[in-house]
């Protein structure tokens, strides 16, 4: 019965369950997720990693004309639509590699967020923590 209750709670969770500030799995940045019209999106709100080798611009972008844009404010989650308990149909940009992946966002009962990126059928997930 608790599994059914958990599924019902997750399915009925409003978009506010994912909107807000999230600490990335590597603890290098905070991403702010919010509404972008009819979709959900997220941008880098703050860089936490420090040091001379930590880039402050999008240096790994495959488009050389975009490599000088700052990471703070950079859209990294784009075009997610509600699909039951998940947000799907979006893309996640990885500034560390310059690659963009098909992605989905899944709020967890413990208050964390699972961000899953896929290429074809190969997927990798990260667990992000809400910043209060």
Where do the language-model regions lie?
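Sec-dependent N-terminal signal peptides
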Residues: 2-12
């Amino acid at each position: 019965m608790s599994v059914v209750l958990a599924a019902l709670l997750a399915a009925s969770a409003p978009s506010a369950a994912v909107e807000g500030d999230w600490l990335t799995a590597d603890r290098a940045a905070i991403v702010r997720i919010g509404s972008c019209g009819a979709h959900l999106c997220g941008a880098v709100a703050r860089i936490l990693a420090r040091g001379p080798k930590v880039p402050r611009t999008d240096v790994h972008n495959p488009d050389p004309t975009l490599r000088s844009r700052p990471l703070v404010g950079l859209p990294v989650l784009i075009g997610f639509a509600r699909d039951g308990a998940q947000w799907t149909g979006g893309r996640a940009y990885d500034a560390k590699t310059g690659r963009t992946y098909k992605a989905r966002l899944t709020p967890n009962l413990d208050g964390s967020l699972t961000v899953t990126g896929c290429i074809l059928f190969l997927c990798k997930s990260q667990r992000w923590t809400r910043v209060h």
